[in-house]
Amino acid sequence: MKPTEEKIQGNASDLPVYLFKQGNNCEAYRYFGAHLETRAGEPGVVFRVWAPHAVAISVVGDFNSWKPGSHPMHKVDGDSVWELFIPGMKEFDVYKYCVTTRAGDLVYKADPYAFHAETRPSNGSKVYDISGFAWHDEAWQAAQKKADVINGPMNIYEMHVGSWKMKEGNKPYNYAELADQLIPYITEMGYTHVELLPVMEYPFDGSWGYQVTGYFAPTSRYGTPKDFMTFVDKLHAAGIGVIMDWVPAHFPKDQFGLYNFDGEPCYEDPNPKRGEHKEWGTMVFDFGRNEVQSFLISSALYWLEQYHIDGLRVDAVASMLYLDYNRKQGEWEPNKDGGKENLEAVAFLRKLNDTVLGRHPHKYMIAEESTAWPMVTKPASDGGLGFNFKWNMGWMNDMLSYMKTDPLFRAGNHNKVTFSFFYAFSENFVLPISHDEVVHGKGSLINKMPGEYEAKFANLRTFFGYMMAHPGKKLLFMGQEFGQFAEWNEAKQLDWMLLGYDKHTELKNYAKTLNAFYKDHPAFWQVDYSWEGFQWIVPDDSQQSVIAFLRKDTAGKQILVVCNFNPVLREGYTLGAPVAGTYKEVLNSDDAAFGGSGAVHNKPVRTHKKPMHGFEQSITITLPPMSTLYFEVPTKRTAKTAADKAKKPGKKTTKAAPAEKAVKKPGRKPKAAPEAPTEKDAKKPGRKPKAAEAPAEKPVKKPTRKAKAEPEPAAEEAPKKRGRKPKAAKE
């Protein structure tokens, strides 16, 4: 290398290293790792790595027969950053760093900043050039920058790349092939986004990707980095957003990974009472260390910028926030103020979200947070954590508990259906029915439903209808949309053969219809996080297990939602109506096309002047057993103006009708309550609505069509031991 080139290279390294050590290098991957480069006219690869405790480091690989010391690195800053340019190395060459520790040991480490890696069980890093990919998603990107992130539709299909669908011989598709299989299905079903379980490189299949060793490398199980770019590009071209699970909370102890990278803690907290999750067998990042902040924030931006990912679902946030998370007395130490909050992690999350959303306000930063921590989705400047969405784990736990309850006993658990509405607008919530709920012996979603075969489907249809209408964005794990009976197994594809049976095909059709209804009706997504988009009508008919409420859009259009959580036909059910006029049934979960009985369809029903539930008029309808109904609410009629009358001279005119009185709200608007890990019974609204009128209960009518017989699901085997244990909600 010529002296002038050396000088330029030296100066160029000063700024990224300085920013890295300050915790402010948000693109550290451009400097660290392995990069193809030409020096003095000779092509090769420059390697850079951070190892503050190392005595010596050399690059080893096939090119030097993995001989330690043959290609030694040197410090570029006289402190902790090591560099070496090796001429002649090329793309896809495998390498590792051989680190000499202060104890005199040699440890072989994969590159923390590698763009590509060997496929397990091998674990070497690979030289890879991520530049030069031809993207075709300009229209998608432009539209996203103009979109209203908070007040737009979001209906997420959560999936595992390797087990959604497989080739013959139980072999997974690569990223590009999977896109061609997935796009027609997602388009047909009408989901707006897919969310991928972690695709960052990981060694153990049974961890599902949550034990990451390569924070800048898409797992090579399914192809190259550019194959993954192709996957994202194709989905964007089809109008489908892509969200990724991202895991900054912890990392595994694999010897080739980040653990004790140079023989001592670098990435993990050195305090054993803070630096390890013993239950998970993983290490906790040192969130207060500047170099670790640069590493993690660079990883987040890398996926959003280099792979055009639309958002990150940040895993296990609760475990980051609390020093006593899953730790017994004596296993943790309080913070400097004597509390249990991890102050460094809180500061890191605020910095992460400020940085990401400061650059990309149209991206999603979604917290998987299961406790009562306040203001998760409020700006850091206001004391919040700065996410723009949060999973509503309280709603999920309450509703799955309620749906598992025998309908005979649901009256005594009615608060589980209504409690979430008391805090629904305290955060920007996503309603998650995720992979965590269909593993580890918990059973699939349909197998959580009580009753025999037909009853399970009826319960699930009712739940899906309720979920779609509840304020908040939506997320459903793959396979639940067609009623997979078996728990999810990452080693097998979904049970697509079930679509050969009527009930499963009909359930899939129902999910598809619900998704289309959601997308086509802004009342279900435009005002998700304010009382302006929701109003109770019947919150407390616990004896009949019925609720009714309104969803509203900004133009004043409304949908009336009525849920009957009991397998009992209810004729003559009267409830308050917000507007006088004709109400039309627009969706019925008990429709025969969806696998229901098809016995009841409400014809357009006019209001009658009978005040109820705080409204001046009411309607009387029939509720099918175990069902969710949607009704189109008539628009408010206004009085004719003088100009309107003058349009038809000579004709007899009538007096303009008096303006309608303001609609009286039912009861007192409940104050939003914070979500709590152990949720107490909800208080009833300030004003108790009149009891809905209903005659004696009638027996359920049997289905009018006979479904194709399906074998009874076999008893499920006990789940295999996973690399990652299920996360317990914070008590």
Regions found by a protein language model. Give the residues of each.
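Substrate-binding/active-site clefts of carbohydrate-active enzymes
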Residues: 118, 138-151, 160-341, 605
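Short, flexible loop/turn elements at secondary-structure junctions
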Residues: 51-53, 77, 88, 160-165, ...
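Arg/Lys-rich, glycine/proline-spaced intrinsically disordered segments
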Residues: 638-644, 648-671, 681-690, 699-706, ...
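Conserved alpha/beta catalytic core and glycan-binding cleft of carbohydrate-active enzymes
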Residues: 308-310, 325-491, 498, 519-590, ...
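Carbohydrate-interacting/catalytic domains
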Residues: 1-153, 176-186, 454-457, 466-476, ...
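Short glycine-biased active-site loop of nucleotidyltransferases that positions the nucleotide triphosphate
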Residues: 74, 205-209, 253-260, 377-378, ...
